[in-house]
């Protein structure tokens, strides 16, 4: 399954919506995706969203789409 993880790059600053970034990751569950990002980054994770087929197809249209691997 593919997940979109919304995060703030700096844990020390107050989250600001305009600074939210995202990455895409393959995992077996939402919990696994969350743990993978938590253990491999210093990001302040805001939300983890599972992408269905239509949402994934839409996200792939973005030229910046890239699956993150750790």
Curated annotation (Swiss-Prot):
The entry's keywords: DNA-directed RNA polymerase, Nucleotidyltransferase, Transcription, Transferase
- EC annotation from Swiss-Prot or TrEMBL: 2.7.7.6
Q: Which Gene3D superfamilies is this protein grouped with?
A: RNAP, epsilon subunit-like
Question: GO cellular-component terms in the record?
Answer: DNA-directed RNA polymerase complex
**Superkingdom of origin organism:** Bacteria
Reactions catalysed: RNA(n) + a ribonucleoside 5'-triphosphate = RNA(n+1) + diphosphate
Q: Which Pfam families match?
A: RpoY
Record bears the keyword Nucleotidyltransferase: yes
Question: Mind telling me which InterPro entries this protein's record contains?
Answer: RpoY
Q: Name one GO biological process term.
A: DNA-templated transcription
Q: What class of enzyme is it?
A: transferase
Q: Which Gene Ontology molecular-function terms are recorded?
A: DNA binding; DNA-directed RNA polymerase activity
Q: Where does this protein have coiled-coil stretches?
A: none
- Keyword Transferase tagged: yes
State the family named in the UniProt similarity comment for this chain: Belongs to the RNA polymerase subunit epsilon family.
Quote the subunit structure annotation. Answer: RNAP is composed of a core of 2 alpha, a beta and a beta' subunit. The core is associated with a delta subunit, and at least one of epsilon or omega. When a sigma factor is associated with the core the holoenzyme is formed, which can initiate transcription.
Q: What does this protein do?
A: A non-essential component of RNA polymerase (RNAP).
Q: What is this protein called?
A: DNA-directed RNA polymerase subunit epsilon
Q: What gene is it encoded by?
A: rpoY
């Amino acid at each position: 399954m593919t997940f979109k993880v919304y995060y703030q790059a700096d844990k020390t600053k107050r989250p600001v919506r305009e600074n939210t970034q995202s990455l895409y990751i393959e995992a077996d569950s939402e919990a696994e995706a969350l743990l993978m990002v938590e253990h491999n980054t210093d990001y302040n994770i805001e939300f983890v969203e599972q992408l269905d087929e239509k949402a994934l197809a839409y996200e792939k249209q973005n030229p910046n789409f890239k699956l993150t691997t750790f």
